[in-house]
Amino acid sequence: MSILVYEVSKSLGNLKVLDRVSLYVRKVSLVALLGPSGSGKSSLLRIIAGLDSPDYGSVWLHGTDMTNTSTQYRHMAFVFQHYALFKNMTVYENISFGLRLRGFSYQKIRNKVNDLLDCLRISDIVSEYPGKLSGGQKQRVALARSLAIKSDFLLLDEPFGALDGELRRHLSKWLKRYLKDNGITTIMVTHDQKEAISMADEIVVLKQGRFLQQGRSKNLYDEPIDYFVGIFSGSFIEFPQLEESLDAPLGSSSSSSSSTKKSMEKDFTPFIPDLIWSQIFTNQSIHHYHFFLRPHELYLESQIDLKAIPVQIKKIIYKRTFVQLDLSITPSSWNITIPIGYQAFRKLNIQSFVQKLYIKPRNQVYLRAYPKKKNIISKQI
């Protein structure tokens, strides 16, 4: 059962909540909506669910225009941030409510509810009322209630937002497998990029009510359409900028800026083996762009390598699953942060901060270039 949203727009007064948003969700796939608060993600879910009407555009479910069709006929379940549990019903009664309405037998209801209670790790609260539950428990009860009726479509708004740690990772993996096994087409809103990458077949990025890019997580990570999508899908390492005016005539430069440029070209030689990129880096047009790499595209080693750039260790931060190295390339004042696994870190055999490391690009590098915009780096996202 596929979902097609075609040029949907929605305004609240003078505020444009959604601006001609289009997306397609293939049958039995999971699409994650990413974007900052206020980008229109939850509003889009409400329109797809039939809880709100668009000012313009249409919503198609499995090839049928359902834009003006009531929610109850859309064969759709949803879990929003306000869990809407029945306060006077126990956890068991909340989860079984939809099954009882559909006339399932007592034994089938019991088996289904108990299975979901076990999988979502809430068997211990089966007789409790919502008023006594934590936010994370309420979330899981609401999710279990939606999954119990096995709809064709499922809409999730931050389904694990109140959870963290190992439980959240476990439930994310379980839910992805459950949705595939039961043939449910799903759209999920999340602020957790790692969760979106691990769960979703495709990711959609929204900003200020506008569609920016849709694709597989690897495509968005490797080749984001702009800086915003790039930084939203993972960490960037920016190439340093030359100290030279953007308004300077082509070919004109001071002796100091010329020496800086030569130093920069020398430092970046390993990164620009391609002829086209070489021309960009030696051309005035470099001043009009920001250039970025992903941290994983860089390789660190402790042995002297004439084809690599020497770097100074500034700081070592030990995280739960990786080590963060803050490094500096002195001639060009290029400060970079590289996360590496503990096994790779041990191989570097770092003895002191005085020790130099050597960095170079891996075999395949996507050198991303985006036009400069005022305050593009410092802008809060």
UniProtKB/Swiss-Prot annotation:
PROSITE patterns: ABC_TRANSPORTER_1, ABC_TRANSPORTER_2, CYSA. Its EC number is 7.3.2.3. It is found in: Plastid, Chloroplast. It catalyses: sulfate(out) + ATP + H2O = sulfate(in) + ADP + phosphate + H(+); thiosulfate(out) + ATP + H2O = thiosulfate(in) + ADP + phosphate + H(+). The keyword Translocase applies. Keywords: ATP-binding, Chloroplast, Nucleotide-binding, Plastid, Sulfate transport, Translocase, Transport. GO terms for cellular component: chloroplast. ATP binds at G35, P36, S37, G38, S39, G40, K41, S42. It is an enzyme of class 7 (translocase). Residues 3-233 form the ABC transporter domain. Pfam families: ABC_tran. InterPro entries: AAA+_ATPase, ABC_SmlMolc_Importer, ABC_transporter-like_ATP-bd, ABC_transporter-like_CS, P-loop_NTPase. SUPFAM superfamilies: P-loop containing nucleoside triphosphate hydrolases. Belongs to the ABC transporter superfamily. Sulfate/tungstate importer (TC 3.A.1.6) family. Part of the ABC transporter complex involved in sulfate/thiosulfate import. Responsible for energy coupling to the transport system. This is Sulfate/thiosulfate import ATP-binding protein CysA. The gene is cysA.
